[in-house]
Amino acid sequence: MSGSNGANASGNSPRPLPLDARDVELTLQPVERATMLPPAAFVDQAVLDWEVDEIFSGWICMGHVSAVAEQGGFLMREIGRTSVFTTKGEDGEVRAFLNTCRHRGSRILTETEGQVRKRIQCPYHAWSYDLEGNLVAAPHMNEVEDFDRSCWGLLEVRSAVVGGLVLIDLSGEAPDPAEHVGHIASFLERYKVPELQRASGTVYHVKANWKGIAENYNECLHCPGVHPELNALSDYRSCLLYTSPSPRD
C-alpha cells in the first residue's frame, strides 16, 4: 500500500492509495526510465473508490461559464457517485445543487445542459424549485402537519467561477478555488477564456477507465498522424497542448 504526502483534493490528509508503493514510485521516475501505471490502477474497484473519495471530492470543472450565461441555463454532471447541476438564478448568481429531489430522491435534470424558465420541476411528483434552490411547490403537502417548505430546498454544493470555468467542490472543504487553479489562471486570461463562446460540441461515450482517456489526451506521440493541425501549433515531443507565448505577449 502506498502512502501520500500533502493533502487530497478536499484539502484533508489522504488515505493510502490501494496500489503497491513500488509500482507507483516507478511511474514517478524521469521519463527515460518511468513505467506506466500498473493494470490494477485501471481495473481494481478499490482504486476507483479511492479516486472518488480522494480526487473527485475536491474542485471539479463542470464546464464553461457561457452555458450558464443566461438565467435558467444549466449544466448537469455525474461526478463519481453524485449527480450535480449548476444554474444561474434570477439574482444573477451561479449556484450548484445536488441533482436530487428532496421528496423521494429522484433525479431532477436528465440532460447534461439546457435551459429552464423560472422553475426546476422534479419529473416524479412535480415538486418544484426556483433557480435559487428554494422549494416553491409541493403538491398534496399542504395537508401534512408542520410541513415547512423553507426546510426542503435543494441541497447546495460549494461552487465558484474562475477564469470562465464553473467549478464545484463536493467536499465543501477544498482549498480556495484560485489556489486550486494556480498558474493556469494566467493561461485562461491570456486566451480570454471567460469571453469565449462554444461553437459546437461532441460527446463520446467510452467504456473505459477515466485515466485511459486522460492518458490519451495528455500524450501526443500520436499527434503527427492523427492531429496534424495541432501538431503544426505545438511540437508533439513537448507534450504541451498550448502554443508558446510570442515576444509580444
Where are the language model's segments positioned?
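Intrinsically disordered or highly flexible coil/loop and linker segments, enriched in small
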Residues: I60-C61, V193, H222-H227
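Rieske [2Fe-2S] iron-sulfur-binding domain
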Residues: V68-G172, A178-F187
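Conserved small/polar residues in nucleotide/adenosyl-binding loops
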Residues: Y242-D249
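A conserved active-site cap/scaffold subdomain adjacent to cofactor or substrate pockets
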Residues: R198-L240
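A general structural signal for short secondary-structure junctions and capping/turn motifs
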Residues: V52, W127, R149-C151, V157-A160, ...
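N-terminal pre-ligand scaffold of iron-sulfur
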Residues: S2-T112, V157-A160
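Alpha/beta-hydrolase-fold enzymes
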Residues: G172-A174, A178-K207, I213-E215
